[in-house]
């Protein structure tokens, strides 16, 4: 089944270096179910508040580069495999994801971005492919096209109908015109990855994945008819709670949730600092890259004037060129893989703090009604029904938030472990390539004898 919620326009395929199409993954009904690269972390029962511990990584045997054994400052042998095989650590790190994927029953992938040019607007749509064995779906496979505003609609609906859960963030909608080209291949691919991660987080959630709006988003041929529905009753009730408790100061906030809020404030602050510094590093690397591109050809031009030094100078020029290529790859990886994860978790922390404020509002409503009931306790012997309902809401909120916090901490540990392993892997490759380039011209320089 296929569908689109956007006006009919002429789509144009955009190049993408994204993941494999979902059609290349075996269906869960087959003998060997496919596994997603971004499966949610499971198993570890982390505490609600942690100092971001680093799980043990797989042990690897040290290898050598140019017959030299390297070691870390603490004496631990370092893995110095060649660039062609230096990603083996990441491959082993993802084994847990693959095994976890075998137990899943809902697979969602965002790919195949296309540009639509209409009279009034130009926009990008993405293919959202679904494979599932769940009985809530009429068919085992779906494929629909969605644009960014459709993802935004889904997230708003999840916030309205699942107020006690952390909703994954979407990538920023607005970009600065003239600074970022929102139709460029790089921007579209970065957004595609973020949207894919957004849907995968929802699909992996034991509650959000069963939300009716998520089902509609994945399957509806015409999403516009569903988007036109009015504000839900639950949303209106939420507004009423905020109005009733706007002047009430919370008295007995659980210490664990106060600690969570403090942790998220510090976490977002640290990530914000990393984000700003990383942007400066990327800027400096780009400037350095531009200088290198001018630096290398100078030796090549010089070699034409020096017959005796022709080969060594050409070698240095080629070496600088190889270093340029390696640095360009390192910078692109930092921009396209490292930065989006940092920004996602900054947005995630802000979203989580919003949910915690909603929890406080529900507790404030409960405390206000409890105090009002206590003043009338002489007139009635039983606790009013509305007070009991408020108490149930608070307990439900607390239970859901604790479960989601544990899940978020597990996902965060896995995401940052993979992120930092990727950073280490890319830096190893960069320095290996530079080392190989410079070592390759040493024999050329040594063989060049001084003229007699």
UniProtKB/Swiss-Prot annotation:
One of its GO terms (biological process) is piecemeal microautophagy of the nucleus. It comes from Xenopus laevis. GO terms for cellular component: early endosome; phagophore assembly site. Keywords: Protein transport, Transport. It holds the Pfam family BAR. Residues 1-20 have a biased composition (Polar residues). Residues 104-225 form the PX domain. It comes from the Eukaryota. CDD domains: BAR_SNX30 (cd07667), PX_SNX7_30_like (cd06860). PROSITE patterns: PX (PS50195). GO terms for molecular function: phosphatidylinositol binding. Residues 1-90 are annotated as: Disordered. The keyword Transcription does not apply. This is Sorting nexin-30.
């Amino acid at each position: 089944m296929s569908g689109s919620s956007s006006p009919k326009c002429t789509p144009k395929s955009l190049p993408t270096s994204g993941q494999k199409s979902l059609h290349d993954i075996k269906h869960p009904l087959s003998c060997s179910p496919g596994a997603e690269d971004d499966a949610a972390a499971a198993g570890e029962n982390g505490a609600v508040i942690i100092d971001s511990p680093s799980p043990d990584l797989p042990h690897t045997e040290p290898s050598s580069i140019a017959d030299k054994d390297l070691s870390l400052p603490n004496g631990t042998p370092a893995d110095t495999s060649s660039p062609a095989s230096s990603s083996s650590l990441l491959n082993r790190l993802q084994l847990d994801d693959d095994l976890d994927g075998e137990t899943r029953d809902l697979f969602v992938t965002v790919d195949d971005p296309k540009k639509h040019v209409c009279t009034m607007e130009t926009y990008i749509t993405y293919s959202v492919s679904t494979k599932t064995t769940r009985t809530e779906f009429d068919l085992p496979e779906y494929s629909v096209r969605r644009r960014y505003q459709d993802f935004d609609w889904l997230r708003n609906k999840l916030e309205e109908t699942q107020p006690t859960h952390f909703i994954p963030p979407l990538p920023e909608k607005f970009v600065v015109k003239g600074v970022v080209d929102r139709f460029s291949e790089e921007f579209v691919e970065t957004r595609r990855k973020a949207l894919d991660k957004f849907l995968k987080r929802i699909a992996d959630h034991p509650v959000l994945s069963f939300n009716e709006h998520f089902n509609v988003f994945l399957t509806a041929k015409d999403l516009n008819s569903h988007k036109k529905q009015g504000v839900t009753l639950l949303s209106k009730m939420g507004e009423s709670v905020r109005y009733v408790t706007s002047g009430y100061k919370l008295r007995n906030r659980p210490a664990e949730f106060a600690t969570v809020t403090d942790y998220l404030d510090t976490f977002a602050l640290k990530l914000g600092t990393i984000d700003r510094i990383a942007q400066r590093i990327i800027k400096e690397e780009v400037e350095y890259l531009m200088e290198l591109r001018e630096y290398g050809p100078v030796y090549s031009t010089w070699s034409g004037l020096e017959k005796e030094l022709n080969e060594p100078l050409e070698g240095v020029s080629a070496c600088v060129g190889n270093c340029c290529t390696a640095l360009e790859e390192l910078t692109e990886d930092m921009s396209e893989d490292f930065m989006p994860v940092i920004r996602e978790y900054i947005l995630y922390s802000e979203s989580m703090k919003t949910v915690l404020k909603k929890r406080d509002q529900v507790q404030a409503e409960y405390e206000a009604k409890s105090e009002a009931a206590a003043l009338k306790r002489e007139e009635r012997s039983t606790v009013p029904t509305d007070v009991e309902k408020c108490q149930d809401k608070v307990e439900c909120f607390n239970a859901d938030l604790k479960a989601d916090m544990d899940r978020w901490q597990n996902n965060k540990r896995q995401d940052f472990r993979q992120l930092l392993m990727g950073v280490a892997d890319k830096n190893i490759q960069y320095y290996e390539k530079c080392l190989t380039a410079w070592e390759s011209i040493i024999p050329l320089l040594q063989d060049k004898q001084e003229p007699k």
